[in-house]
From Swiss-Prot:
The keyword Signal applies. It comes from Salmonella typhimurium (strain LT2 / SGSC1412 / ATCC 700720). This is Periplasmic serine endoprotease DegP. DegP is indispensable for bacterial survival at temperatures above 42 degrees Celsius, however is also able to digest its natural substrates in a reducing environment at temperatures as low as 20 degrees Celsius. The gene is degP. GO terms for molecular function: identical protein binding; serine-type endopeptidase activity.
């Protein structure tokens, strides 16, 4: 107890000294000095940047799968059924809204959503955001930091990378952001995230670059994310990740959130990728990707040892498609791609993501390791006959997968499946080969599309999975 009293007395004494006239004069001098040199602050940079970050509100409708009722109950839920009349507890159930008799496999449901965006061209009103922010939108409203509101329309969308470009109608007095060279980023660089989390309005958080080239997250088909610990939450999608110069280094896209909240692991699409994709959208209204025409995997120490490759990182080529850009350049199965245009390639996913932003006709150079020798090949990207398509362009009920022709009329290969997508929910997996649909053989994407053009209420896919043949049913 005495020790406590003494400690408090000492504190009181020091406070008394601090309040003496002599100390007050010293404090005023110190305060003046601090004011003169100014405390470090992000405010001056943010004053220039925040007018280029916008809030986006959308309205639209989407197709949702409705449950299919057992056949012996369907007679009770027709249009004239007492179960579906006004006042019935079943009136608004899916079974009375087209699902009771099997419906058409889906039902239109209206939605409202919000997100963020970044102005990249003030004169033309171009705003970049995430595809998932404006997907299926019929109405898009953009609000600036000064409160002004504008209508906007979609210029182009790319579900594979989750980038979309919208255009503000009748733009006036806008401020565009400057894009940085995201290839120059280093782990440890400071980052600032700006967006509209939870619809609160413009919000700023800060952090650092935690990692670069993140892939394998099953968030998008082309993944080459910047990882940051700057807080990113729902509504931040499409917002800006900037450096301390106020330059755009990425578009905030996703978070790792096991419990739905921020835990300091957020992901942004690099600005160089954004620049390449949006320039194609401006020119073509879509992304026209060039392709190498190879299949491969990540190179790890075990694979390197088994294949007697003197490298630890790179993209291992397991197959080269006939008549592809890679085949014409002389790339062979067993090669390891170590660089693209002179810059190191760490993985197959990184190679795929970088090539995936390049348009048809792009000329590139690849550094290879072949039987222990380093060689360089030059090639021009072309539109491959093995070109992948988004499954939603074939049939809305299997949205969330990428597919390509297997070749030699042997079916359609599922090359990737997004987690929790409709495609994943019906059981499709990466590597599946669709060889039939609704009791009709499927040799290629064109045949699958033709079968599904009739929009069947029930879809039965015959899948070859490894050595097994299975059926997946969607209704």
């Amino acid at each position: 107890m005495k020790k406590t009293t003494l400690a408090m007395s000492a504190l009181a004494l020091s406070l008394g000294l601090a309040l003496s006239p002599l100390s007050a004069t010293a404090a005023e001098t110190s305060s003046s000095a601090m004011t003169a040199q100014q405390m470090p602050s992000l405010a001056p940079m943010l004053e220039k940047v925040m007018p280029s970050v916008v809030s986006i509100n959308v309205e639209g409708s989407t197709t949702v799968n409705t449950p299919r009722m057992p056949r012996n109950f369907q007679q009770f839920f027709g249009d004239d059924s007492p179960f579906c009349q006004d006042g019935s507890p079943f009136q608004n159930s899916p079974f009375c809204q087209g699902g009771g008799n099997g419906g058409n496999g889906g039902q239109q449901q209206k939605f409202m959503a919000l997100g963020s965006g970044v102005i990249i061209d003030a004169a033309k009103g171009y705003v970049v955001t995430n595809n998932h922010v404006v997907d299926n939108a019929s109405v898009i409203k953009v609000q600036l930091s000064d409160g002004r509101k504008f209508d906007a329309k979609v210029v182009g969308k790319d579900p594979r990378s989750d980038i979309a470009l919208i255009q503000i109608q009748n733009p006036k007095n806008l401020t565009a952001i400057k894009l940085a060279d995201s290839d120059a980023l280093r782990v440890g660089d400071y980052t600032v995230a700006i967006g509209n989390p939870f619809g609160l309005g413009e919000t700023v958080t800060s952090g650092i670059v935690s990692a670069l080239g993140r892939s394998g997250l099953n968030v998008e088909n082309y993944e080459n994310f910047i990882q940051t610990d700057a807080a990113i939450n729902r509504g931040n999608s499409g917002g800006a990740l900037v450096n301390l110069n106020g330059e755009l280094i990425g578009i905030n896209t996703a978070i790792l959130a096991p419990d739905g909240g921020n835990i300091g692991i957020g992901f942004a699409i690099p600005s160089n990728m954004v620049k390449n994709l949006t320039s194609q959208m401006v020119e073509y209204g879509q992304v026209k990707r060039g392709e190498l025409g190879i299949m491969g995997t990540e190179l790890n120490s075990e694979l390197a040892k088994a294949m007697k490759v003197d490298a630890q990182r790179g993209a291992f080529v397991s197959q080269v498609m006939p008549n592809s850009s890679a085949a014409k350049a002389g790339i062979k199965a067993g090669d390891v791609i170590t660089s693209l245009n002179g810059k190191p390639i760490s993985s197959f996913a990184a190679l795929r993501a970088q090539v995936g932003t390049m348009p048809v006709g792009s000329k590139i150079s690849l550094g290879l390791l072949r039987e222990g020798k380093a060689i360089t090949v030059n090639l021009e990207l072309q539109q491959s006959s093995q070109s992948q398509v988004d499954s939603s362009t074939i049939f809305s009920g299997i949205e969330g997968a990428e597919m390509s022709n297997k070749g030699q009329d042997k079916g359609v290969v599922v090359s990737s499946v997004k987690a929790n997508s409709p495609a994943a929910q019906i059981g499709l997996k990466k590597g599946d080969v669709i060889i039939g649909a609704n009791q009709q053989p499927v040799k290629n994407i064109a045949e699958l599309r033709k079968i599904l053009d009739s929009k069947p209420s029930v879809l039965a896919l015959n899948i070859q999975r490894g050595d097994s043949s299975i059926y997946l049913l969607m209704q």
